[in-house]
């Protein structure tokens, strides 16, 4: 190699040393000093792993003094390069900069600079980079972004609500689905979309204290959202790190009590600039015109400051009109400010609901009915649509659907309230109750007697709670020596049931964790029954493992023993047998227990087994739940109201189960109350709202489209390629499960989202739903998104050299493959990627500038190429640098047309879509006051900013590959 003192070279193997200077040489060796690190390297002159650094006109370089020069001309004097150009800080022209004075900390970021500096990547990394660009761009443009990555069944009504609300600016809605229909999942889907698109970055979830862990688990397991749980201890700890502790985390969960009981804490919450507020169990916020509760006022303060609000609540009919109005008032106080006016409005919606029922029935409409429809819709030129809807023509159904849609748009609360009922949603199993009456052992009888004497001063409620769990009473007297499981007939019955149903999965729920642990030991030691335990003393990871073991079909646990609190937020639809070893104290907890199996998507009828001891509180409660509320075999929306009204009487019967006088009358009265309330609820059903919330055929198509996207084989191929190149070990465990573990030779020390001890993944939704320890990998999973960012945010794969063996072309023929990226810079909230994501434009140029990309598809071409080692590659680049530079110049002139076309299309699409949305909502505003002014203003502002950002869009070279033809 021709070396001269003062020349600048870069090491092919140690590029982190920066720019080296030739400081000494003899006949066989050359010494380079690397000023940025102060290190010297001695190389053999004949075959040294270094590359000469040469810049070209158009490049910008930095001097050792820090000023920059835009190169206009390159000269050579005595073997040294001299750059002539314009100094950027002073705008002085014809400034010269000798290469010896270049900044030694030079970083080559442009692909062409890296190529010319000998920083040549492996060929497979270039291919990965191109695929990453291509797939990322496609995913940004895919419909239903944000709805595909969650670990949930694809349930149409949930997807419909999430798709509608998740795309809105700062959504403010009330989710009021009946129990078991998945309000938490709907809220999670909305959050996931908003966070993924950048519409929201900071989220606060406020829930009752008992549901905090349930939300934490659901958000992490289903949506890969890592929330921080704030309690008194965490709040105090965070005060050391920031004036406002809530600014230390982006995603926060706290309890309503935690938020309410401290004035400064509430102020900190209000000042933390959240984008979205989620409030679960919002029906517990008590409000009246004269005296709103402190809890309600706390949420009201937050709702005034946070742009987006999701309230999750029980069904409106259960709560009464005033309570329902109070929720809506939190969402839009300007719209819902007068309760009397609201009541009047609700009455006026009845004709609208009747009209929709008429249209959906499909019968011919009378003239009066047609006139009524015309009056309700109140639009000009509606006559042809009405005639079409009432005809036998092929378009009659489409016309009816259009009329239903127009009526829904005029429905008072359809934009702010979503409510699905079990009647309107298919897919629920039946419930079958099997009660097993068992004798009360003498040991328990004695313990109960003694307890009654000693606890005479206890309240009726405390005695009632004690009587529900006789094993606890016995254990208290006997201490550690008490072995209640040796004589309790429920244990014998359970062992008999499990041994006679060994092929079936059984979920056993009991109130206390200690009971679950003791039962596990008995089942294992006496009958060798494989039982997993699940209780609140376990970590989330331990619970995951227990759930995964229970889910395994062949080698897994037959039974899962859960405590009351431990089972919150977990669903086990793959099992259909539920054993209640004891009974919970109120109907809400009973429904929660059954709800572990009775979920939409359950494939079998649920068998509910209740072994109970006679002459105990259990025998009282089993009758009251079944005969008084019908709560075992059907969901019981009336349960809480009747429980509250019958509480005093019920407690007395539970505290003294032997006193049965009048109990039959109580059951009869509760049953009558239940039937009356149920009829009242049914009559008050808002069928129009249910149709709107359910989504009908549109929601079915949405679920089907996402299911089709689940079968994308590109994802699996790309993910495995990514893991290979990053250096992540993959161990195929069968059953569509793969274990990923970090290796010692990864591209980065820590791959974001991959735990130190690894993780189990699956690409199959069904597997992910039955195996909670397996992460469900989609294009939206953090492992894939982080992998894309890792490759594309750096220079991995941005420059490479390949050989093309092709005897039809002359040896030494050059081709240059260029990958440009067309993109626009804008704040994430604008969601510019909907219209112009970073889009790759591939060109394959010969020396004359002919673009062969259309004729030669990337993957086919890539398979024909072979790799070149870095050292040989550097020599090749040095030999053809001027030719490559000339082809690059031709590429620069050609890219503009393609890029401009992409940008113009994006502008047109953005303008049409955003202007159309604005026009539709403005027109609707005239007939539906629930469309907020701030929402319209935000859409208009968003449209202007999007179009302005697209005007500023540009393009840049992202990667290049030099291809040299060979015949060997």
UniProtKB/Swiss-Prot annotation:
Helicase C-terminal domain ranges (all copies): 490-685
Keyword list, A-Z: Activator, ATP-binding, DNA-binding, Helicase, Hydrolase, Nucleotide-binding, Transcription, Transcription regulation
EC number of this enzyme: 3.6.4.-
Entry superkingdom: Bacteria
Coiled-coil zones: none
Listed GO biological process terms: regulation of DNA-templated transcription
InterPro entries in alphabetical order: Helicase_ATP-bd (IPR014001), Helicase_C-like (IPR001650), Helicase_RapA (IPR023949), P-loop_NTPase (IPR027417), RapA_C (IPR022737), SNF2-like_sf (IPR038718), SNF2/RAD54-like_C (IPR049730), SNF2_N (IPR000330)
One MF term in the entry's GO annotations: helicase activity
Amino acids binding ATP: 177-184
Boundaries of every Helicase ATP-binding domain copy: 164-334
Stored Gene3D superfamilies: 2.30.30.140, 2.30.30.930, 3.30.360.80, 6.10.140.1500, 6.10.140.2230, P-loop containing nucleotide triphosphate hydrolases, Tandem AAA-ATPase domain
PROSITE patterns assigned to the protein according to its UniProt record, in alphabetical order: HELICASE_ATP_BIND_1, HELICASE_CTER
The keyword Lipoprotein is assigned to this record: no
Disulfide bonds listed in the record: none
SMART domains: DEXDc (SM00487), HELICc (SM00490)
The family this protein is said to belong to: Belongs to the SNF2/RAD54 helicase family. RapA subfamily.
HAMAP family for this protein: Helicase_RapA (MF_01821)
Entry function: Transcription regulator that activates transcription by stimulating RNA polymerase (RNAP) recycling in case of stress conditions such as supercoiled DNA or high salt concentrations. Probably acts by releasing the RNAP, when it is trapped or immobilized on tightly supercoiled DNA. Does not activate transcription on linear DNA. Probably not involved in DNA repair.
Quaternary state and interactors: Interacts with the RNAP. Has a higher affinity for the core RNAP than for the holoenzyme. Its ATPase activity is stimulated by binding to RNAP.
Stated name of the protein: RNA polymerase-associated protein RapA
Organism listed in the record: Salmonella newport (strain SL254)
């Amino acid at each position: 190699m021709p070396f001269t003192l003062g020349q600048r070279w870069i090491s092919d193997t140690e590029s982190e040393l920066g720019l080296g200077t030739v400081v000494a040489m003899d006949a066989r060796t050359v010494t380079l000093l690397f000023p940025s690190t102060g290190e010297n390297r001695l190389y053999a002159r004949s075959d040294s792993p270094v590359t000469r650094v040469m810049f070209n006109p158009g490049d910008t370089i930095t001097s050792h003094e820090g000023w920059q020069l835009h190169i206009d001309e390159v000269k050579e004097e005595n073997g040294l390069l001299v750059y002539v150009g314009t100094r950027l800080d002073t705008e002085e022209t014809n400034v010269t900069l000798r290469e010896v004075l270049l900044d030694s900390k030079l970083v080559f970021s442009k692909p062409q600079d890296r190529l010319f500096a000998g920083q040549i990547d492996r060929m497979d990394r270039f291919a990965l980079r191109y695929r990453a660009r291509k797939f990322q761009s496609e995913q940004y443009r895919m419909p239903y972004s944000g709805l595909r990555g969650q670990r949930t069944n694809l349930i149409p009504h949930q997807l419909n609500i999430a798709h509608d609300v998740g795309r809105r600016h700062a959504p403010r809605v009330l989710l009021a689905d009946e129990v078991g229909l998945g309000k938490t999942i709907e809220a999670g889907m909305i959050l996931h979309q908003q966070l993924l698109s950048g519409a929201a970055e900071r989220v606060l979830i406020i829930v009752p204290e008992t549901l905090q862990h349930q939300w934490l688990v659901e958000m992490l397991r289903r949506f890969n959202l890592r929330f921080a749980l704030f309690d008194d201890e965490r709040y105090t700890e965070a005060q050391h790190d920031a004036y406002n502790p809530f600014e230390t985390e982006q995603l926060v969960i706290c309890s309503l009590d935690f938020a309410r009981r401290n004035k400064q804490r509430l102020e900190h919450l209000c000042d933390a600039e959240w984008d979205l507020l989620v409030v679960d169990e919002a029906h517990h916020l008590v409000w009246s015109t004269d005296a709103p509760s402190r809890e309600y006022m706390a949420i009201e303060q937050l709702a005034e400051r946070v742009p987006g609000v999701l309230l999750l609540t029980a069904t409106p009919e259960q709560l009464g009109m005033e309570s329902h109005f109070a929720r809506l008032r939190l969402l839009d106080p300007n719209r819902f400010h007068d309760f009397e006016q609201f009541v009047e409005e609700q009455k006026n919606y009845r004709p609208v609901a009747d009209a929709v029922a008429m249209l959906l029935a499909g019968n011919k409409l009378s003239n009066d009915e047609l006139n009524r429809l015309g009056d309700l819709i109140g639009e000009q030129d509606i006559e042809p649509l009405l005639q079409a809807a009432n005809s036998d023509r092929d378009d009659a159904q489409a016309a009816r659907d259009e009329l239903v849609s127009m009526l829904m748009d005029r429905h008072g609360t359809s934009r702010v309230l979503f409510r699905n009922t079990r009647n309107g949603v298919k897919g629920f199993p039946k419930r079958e109750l099997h009660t097993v009456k068992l004798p009360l052992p003498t040991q328990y009888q004695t313990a109960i007697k003694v307890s009654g004497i000693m606890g005479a001063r206890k309240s009726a409620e405390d005695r009632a709670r004690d009587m529900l769990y006789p094993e606890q009473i016995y254990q208290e007297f006997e201490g550690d020596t008490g072995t209640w499981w040796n004589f309790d007939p429920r244990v014998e019955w359970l062992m008999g049931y499990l041994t006679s149903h060994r092929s079936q999965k059984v979920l056993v729920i009991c109130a206390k964790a200690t009971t679950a642990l003791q039962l596990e030991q008995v089942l294992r030691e006496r009958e060798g029954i494989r039982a997993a335990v699940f209780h609140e003393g376990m970590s989330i990871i331990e619970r995951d493992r227990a759930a995964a073991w229970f889910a395994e079909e062949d080698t897994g646990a037959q039974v899962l023993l859960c405590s009351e609190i431990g089972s919150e937020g977990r669903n086990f639809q793959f099992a259909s047998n539920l054993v209640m070893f004891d009974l919970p104290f109120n109907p809400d907890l009973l429904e929660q227990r059954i709800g572990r199996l009775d979920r939409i998507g359950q494939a079998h009828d649920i068998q509910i087994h209740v072994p109970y001891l006679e002459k105990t509180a259990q025998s009282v409660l089993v009758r009251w739940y079944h005969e008084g509320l019908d709560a075992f075999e059907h969901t019981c929306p009336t349960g809480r109201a009747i429980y509250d009204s019958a509480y005093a009487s019920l407690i007395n019967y539970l505290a003294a189960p032997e006193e049965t006088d009048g109990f039959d009358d109580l059951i009869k009265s509760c049953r009558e109350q239940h039937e009356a309330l149920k009829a009242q609820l049914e009559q008050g059903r808002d069928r129009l709202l249910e149709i709107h919330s359910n989504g009908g055929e549109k929601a079915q198509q949405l679920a089907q489209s996402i299911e089709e996207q689940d079968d994308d084989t590109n994802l699996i191929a790309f993910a495995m390629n990514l893991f290979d190149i990053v250096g992540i070990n993959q161990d195929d465990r069968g059953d569509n499960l793969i274990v990923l573990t970090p290796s010692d030779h990864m591209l980065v020390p820590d791959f974001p989202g991959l735990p130190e001890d690894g993780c189990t993944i699956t690409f199959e939704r069904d597997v992910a739903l039955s195996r909670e320890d397996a992460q469900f990998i989609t294009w939206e999973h953090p492992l894939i998104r982080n992998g894309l960012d890792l490759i594309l945010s750096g220079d991995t794969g941005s420059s490479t050299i390949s050989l093309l063996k092709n005897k039809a072309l002359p040896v030494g023929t050059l081709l240059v493959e260029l990958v440009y990226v067309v993109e626009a810079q804008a704040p994430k909230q604008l969601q510019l990627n909907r219209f112009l994501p970073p889009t790759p434009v591939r060109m394959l140029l010969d020396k004359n500038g002919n673009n062969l990309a259309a004729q030669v598809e990337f993957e086919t071409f890539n398979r024909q190429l072979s790799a070149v080692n870095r050292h040989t590659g550097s020599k090749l680049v040095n030999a053809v640098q001027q030719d490559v530079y000339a082809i690059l110049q031709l590429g620069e002139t050609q890219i503009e047309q393609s890029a401009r076309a992409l940008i113009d299309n994006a502008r047109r699409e953005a303008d049409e879509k955003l202007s159309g949305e604005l026009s539709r909502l403005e027109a609707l505003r005239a007939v539906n006051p629930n469309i907020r002014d701030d929402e319209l203003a935000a859409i208009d502002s968003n449209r202007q900013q999007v179009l302005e950002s697209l005007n500023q869009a540009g393009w840049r070279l992202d990667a290049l590959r030099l291809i040299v033809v060979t015949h060997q």
